[in-house]
Each structure stands twice: as structure tokens, then as C-alpha cells.
């Protein structure tokens, strides 16, 4: 078994590696900063044909399956449970790797509308919810200047 951070990070930054992986969709880059100004220890790039979950004004997409917009909070939570069953499973704990998979993304404030009665809002082109469960993950360790492919 190779050690987790066995790729040299001297020639690539997380941003340059993210750009090189443009052909792999969906993908994401998580950069971390401590105290608003100092680069934290790890950066993550998720990519590959894992699973994408997106809720927008056209409905809810879980992978290639398209559903109607959930009618209530129960339907939304059930759809997210369904998505978790379909997503690639995170690897068991790998020493030195703080993130090894799972759903990464966001739920906008508008998702609150499934749980609370709020005034109607003008529809946006931005998804109300967008998560990606990547097939592969590059983990940059800024302290050791190593990269792990998980």
C-alpha cells in the first residue's frame, strides 16, 4: 500500500490541477483559509462521474433521473436519502486524509421554503441546492507539499 501523499505537489497548485481536470464533470474545488487570510493545510478537488444532485426551477435531478420539484420538506428529504443511496460511498478513514468522499455542495437559503412559509420570491437561475459526490478526489497537503489521489 502506497502512503496517501505519494504524489509531489511541487509543479501544480490546486487551481492549476482543477483547470487540467476540466474534462471531468461534475467537479469542484474546495480551498480552505484560516482566519480569512492564511491558507489552511488542505485543498480538495472532487471529480469524476460520481453523482450530481441539483434542485432548480426545472425540478430535481439526481444523476440522470429528473423529478418534479418536491411538494414539501418530507419529499425533499426523501429525495436526498435516495441520492445518498446512489452516491459513491466514501472510503473508510485513511490516515492523514481528512476528507475521503461524500456529498459536497450547498443548499441555498431558498431551501428553507420547504420547511417554513415565506413570501414568494422571483425565481433564480441559480440552483437552490447543488451537491456532488465525486468518484475521485485529489487532496493537496500544503504542509508536506504532497498530493493524494483518493
Predicted segments with their positions:
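Signature of the chorismate-utilizing enzyme
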Residues: 1-150
